[in-house]
């Protein structure tokens, strides 16, 4: 071994280190979370939301994507939203629990406004982890 390299057949070859990223889609989300979301909306005079398969798939894809890239963003939302009927998206990072993510969104003016949109009737919610952090995605739609 020579510094950060290995000697192979008289030649010094750099040692390659590979980072393997594991992304786990976390089983999400409990009925309690939907109850919390709907209670929040109903307290503001809005109808309850129902879970949507297409919005759930969209939220799952984006949660996995954020975890794989270790980046919280809205990448892809605007190009995908029409096909799934999505109207708004909330993302979060750093919350270990569903209730933490909801509290974070309720405490943020823009995210709160999304949760109180009067023209949405359905949602998809997913969470994914990269081994260190957990990423959340809530997609709201008609």
What are these regions (language model features)?
Residues 48-49, 73, 122:
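Residue-level detector of short coil/turn "hinge" positions at structural boundaries
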Residues 30-67:
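A short alpha-helix/helix-coil micro-patch that ends at or immediately precedes a cysteine
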Residues 1-12:
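Short, Lys/Arg-enriched N-terminal segments with co-localized hydrophobic residues
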Residues 43, 84, 119-120:
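A short, amphipathic edge element
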Residues 39, 95-142:
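Disulfide-stabilized extracellular recognition modules
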Residues 54-101, 115:
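Short, surface-exposed glycine/acidic/tryptophan-bearing loops
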Residues 20-28:
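Bacterial N-terminal signal peptides
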Residues 13-17:
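Positively charged n-region of N-terminal signal peptides that target proteins for export
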């Amino acid at each position: 071994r020579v510094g950060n390299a290995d000697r192979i057949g008289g030649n010094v070859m750099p040692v390659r280190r590979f980072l393997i990223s594991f992304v786990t889609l976390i089983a999400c989300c409990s009925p309690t979370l939907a109850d919390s979301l709907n209670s929040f909306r109903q307290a503001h005079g809005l109808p309850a939301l129902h879970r949507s398969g297409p919005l759930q798939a969209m939220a799952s894809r984006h949660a996995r994507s954020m975890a794989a890239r270790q980046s919280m963003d809205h990448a892809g939302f605007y190009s995908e939203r029409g096909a799934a009927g999505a109207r708004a998206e909330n993302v979060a990072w750093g919350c270990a629990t569903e209730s933490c993510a909801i509290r974070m969104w309720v405490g943020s003016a823009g995210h709160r406004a999304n949760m109180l949109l009067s023209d949405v009737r359905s949602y998809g919610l997913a969470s994914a982890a990269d081994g260190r952090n957990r990423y959340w995605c809530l997609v709201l739609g008609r």
